[in-house]
Amino acid sequence: MRPEPTEHPERTAAQRLYQYNVDLKVAFVLYAVAKLHLPDLLADGPRTTADLAAATGSDPSRLRRLLRAAAGADALREVPEDSFELAPMGDLLRSGHPRSMRGMTTFFAEPDVLAAYGDLVESVRTGVPAFQLRHREPLYDFLARPQHKEVRDEFDAAMVEFGQYFADDFLTSFDFGRFTRFADIGGGRGQFLAGVLTAVPSSTGVLVDGPAVAASAHKFLASQNLTERVEVRIGDFFDVLPTGCDAYVLRGVLEDWADADAVRLLVRIRQAMGDAPEARLLILDSVIGETGELGKVLDLDMLVLVEGEHRTRAQWDDLLARAGFDIVGIHPAGDVWAVIECRGTAG
């Protein structure tokens, strides 16, 4: 995150500050492009500005300027006859793309979400998550309200997309083949668990999550031909944790949670694990100071949106010790994440 030393460090710093301000504008451009469903409209090839304006109910002149900005950001390409076509980045904003990143692009720029980032200063001063300051309720309560369904759908899509984006980093950084039965706690529709079971064909799994994902989980696992290998348990994490697994996985769960709640869940997992010497808790999360600099920046999302945080090694050691675990090893997985391998402590 720091510029390379040059003969003109102040100029380099100024260039980076300017670029950060431009990047913020690019995020808004991509948000507008996605919300107008322009990538979906361009999926079959170039279309004119007039055609796109009619399809989206937009002012042609202003739409042209948005399209031009999107081309400047490499999401679209400007072609002859006042027309535009998808570039590879824009293609990833299509709703039906198998590796779409539309949800994360729209969710974080939604006005209700973006407004919370505007309260960052007050959040730092008060110690209260900025989202809660802005909306007078926690993020997940807000998302559960029927009037916020569109934002909730974008959030859910963003979580799936993050999982897709980072899955290979996790799967190639750690030997999951050591285990035979996985419990994926808070595993959503089962996307990561499916990747693990595909990589380890002899293994089985238990997917644990809340009622909101039940239908999508069963549908997704069926699409991956994994129905016979995965047991789906729907309910409160504290009530439905399975016993008898040799790997308990928490992927991106504890970063959302304050320490007290995290310890409660970890204690419950420790009870479910029992005393099998080879059983492991695998926490897929950031370790500040041992993973890349980007993890420090992404911790801003935790600061603004929820009660959790990206923790340091010392914080992880303390948190896990309070629940009866110690860390066997930390396996970096790309620039942000790591697999934190934990075992139960004796006694």
UniProtKB/Swiss-Prot annotation:
Membership in a protein family: Belongs to the class I-like SAM-binding methyltransferase superfamily. Cation-independent O-methyltransferase family.
pH dependence: Optimum pH is 8.8.
Binding site for S-adenosyl-L-methionine: 209, 235-237
Known pathway: Antibiotic biosynthesis
Function description: Catalyzes the S-adenosyl methionine-dependent conversion of 8-amino-8-demethyl-D-riboflavin (AF) into 8-methylamino-8-demethyl-D-riboflavin (MAF) and roseoflavin (RoF), the last two steps in the biosynthesis of the antibiotic roseoflavin.
Quaternary organization: Homodimer.
Chemical reaction(s) catalysed: 8-amino-8-demethylriboflavin + 2 S-adenosyl-L-methionine = roseoflavin + 2 S-adenosyl-L-homocysteine + 2 H(+)
Organism: Streptomyces davaonensis (strain DSM 101723 / JCM 4913 / KCC S-0913 / 768)
GO biological process, one term: methylation
EC number: 2.1.1.343
A Pfam cross-reference name: Dimerisation
Disruption phenotype: Inactivation of the gene leads to a strain that synthesizes AF but not MAF or RoF.
Family matches, as SUPFAM superfamilies: S-adenosyl-L-methionine-dependent methyltransferases, Winged helix' DNA-binding domain
UniProt temperature dependence: Optimum temperature is 52 degrees Celsius.
Protein name: 8-amino-8-demethylriboflavin N,N-dimethyltransferase
